[in-house]
Swiss-Prot record:
Keywords: 4Fe-4S, Amino-acid biosynthesis, Branched-chain amino acid biosynthesis, Iron, Iron-sulfur, Leucine biosynthesis, Lyase, Metal-binding. Heterodimer of LeuC and LeuD. Its cofactor is [4Fe-4S] cluster. Belongs to the aconitase/IPM isomerase family. LeuC type 1 subfamily. It comes from the Bacteria. It catalyses: (2R,3S)-3-isopropylmalate = (2S)-2-isopropylmalate. This is 3-isopropylmalate dehydratase large subunit. GO terms for biological process: L-leucine biosynthetic process.
């Protein structure tokens, strides 16, 4: 019987498979940031161990860096300590670090792909739940805990049981104005936020292969939001064209050999998945979350659902709680509610394509007077590219704040956050209670939808904007 893409990558990395034991996988790339690494390095130090493969380990600062200044003190004492500790640890253990003053600094899941650190067929881990982003390249990428970070630093391996497999196929082409973010939110709306639990997902279908690499990264980034361990997309010419010429990409004969191997990284026709989910791309409309998990999502032209519309008692109770927290009334349109803040950024939507999409909407318009709108590029490289294209000028003239790279308002670990009951149109990946600030209300949308909400002062259907 044939094998799935996941099975091919998984099996190629089994280093030890003792009977009755969880297999040990070799890890090709380990990405490190300031929040989940301090205790891991302390563990190495206490046990007298070194980092086994420094050439496969890359660190950056992203979670709590300020987006208004390069001052390491700007986000508070805890943030300063974490960043100073990362500098010390990387110096001591010989790990490459792109700190806040480096031209390659950025959100770890933006920085890795744009430098060619992320390549098809690799195993990639990071102490961060959205590591699945890198699966857009046909790599097996997933988040790990701090004790596992230490284990990978010390051994370049990790115990990892084989997951179940799920195929999510988005058939046909999407309508104009429908983005990767809309696709993945529609998927999660169908599967629910727990539908992928225990699975590694492969995204496929014409609507997926039509996406750019930036779009594919958006989709895989949110695989974790449907409960999956990881999400993969088979590499193709789009993938190879994106990688070629990047800093850590193979060159010459090595490139030719790599591409030949990468072309084998696809699910065999006779492979069997444990579960299959199918969506019709033409049915997908601009999506907006209304609740407190990404599965609580509707098309922008649909009314806010009533709890009674859910047959499952758990979903019904969750909907009641979410509506109360979000300050929403069932049956109303989301466009009836004012937004207070808008955030375009995060490892989901902070790449150059996302900046361009928001700029198209912003150009020649003005942010509503009651709205604070932040544009936070995902890396120094994205920021430089956007500025070379004049996007920063478009944003600033429209009344958006053009910020420095970092995770920013996605998780409120710096000073970018919501106040109590403030409503935010956000391009990030999680709308949990308090995620963007205590009692803050988060609605997940695409960059174009977020920019339009900033200008209108409330949610609008981007398809009506010309």
């Amino acid at each position: 019987m044939g094998k799935t893409l996941y099975e091919k990558v998984y099996e190629a990395h089994v280093a030890v498979a003792a009977e009755g034991e969880t297999p040990i996988l070799y890890i090709d790339r380990h990405l490190v940031h300031e929040v989940t690494s301090p205790q891991a390095f302390d563990g190495l130090r206490e046990k007298g161990r070194q980092v086994r493969q420094v050439s496969k380990t890359f660190a950056t600062m992203d979670h709590n860096v300020s987006t208004t200044t390069k001052d390491i003190n700007a986000s508070g004492e805890m943030a300063r300590i974490q960043m100073e500790t990362l500098i010390k640890n990387c110096q001591e253990f010989g790990v490459t670090l792109y700190d806040i003053n480096h031209k390659y600094q950025g959100i770890v899941h933006v920085m890795g792909p744009e430098l060619g650190i992320t390549l098809p067929g690799m195993t990639i881990v990071c102490g961060d739940s959205h590591t699945a982003t890198h699966g857009a390249f046909g790599s097996l990428a997933f988040g790990i805990g701090t004790s596992e970070v230490e284990h990978v630093l010390a051994t370049q391996t990790l115990k990892q049981a084989r997951a179940k497999t799920m195929k999510i196929e988005v058939q046909g082409k999407v309508a104009d104005g429908i983005t990767a973010k809309d696709i993945v939110l529609a998927i999660i709306g169908k599967t629910t936020a727990a539908g992928g639990t225990g699975y590694v997902v492969e995204f496929c279908g014409e609507a997926i292969t039509d996406l750019s690499m930036e779009g594919r990264m958006t989709v895989c980034n949110m695989a974790i939001e449907l409960g999956a361990k990881a999400g993969l997309i088979a590499p193709d010419k789009t993938t190879f064209d994106y990688i070629k010429g990047r800093k850590f990409a193979p060159t010459g004969a090595d490139w030719d050999a790599a591409v030949e191997y990468w072309k084998t990284l696809k699910t065999d026709e006779d492979a069997k998945f444990d579960a299959v989910v199918t969506l019709n791309a033409a049915d997908i409309k601009p999506q907006v979350t209304w609740g407190t998990n990404p599965g609580q999502v509707i098309a922008v032209d649909e009314p806010i659902p009533a709890p009674e519309s859910f047959s499952d008692p758990v979903e019904k109770a969750s909907a009641e709680k979410a509506l109360a927290y979000m300050g929403l009334e069932a049956g109303k349109s989301l466009s009836e509610y004012k937004v207070d803040k808008v955030f375009v950024g995060s490892c989901t939507n902070s790449r150059i394509e996302d900046m361009r999409a928001a700029a198209v909407v912003a150009k020649g318009r003005k942010v509503a007077s009651h709205v604070q709108a932040l544009i936070v590029p995902g890396s120094e490289q994205v920021k430089a590219q956007a500025e070379a294209e004049g996007l920063d000028v478009i944003f600033k003239e429209a009344g958006f704040e053009w910020r420095l790279p970092g995770c920013s308002m996605c998780l409120a670990m710096n000073n970018d956050r919501l106040g109590p009951h403030e409503r935010c149109a956000s391009t990030s990946n999680r709308n949990f209670e308090g995620r963007q600030g205590r009692d803050g209300r988060t609605h997940l949308v695409s960059p174009a939808m977020a920019a339009a909400a900033a200008i209108a002062g409330h949610f609008v259907d981007i398809r009506d904007w010309k």
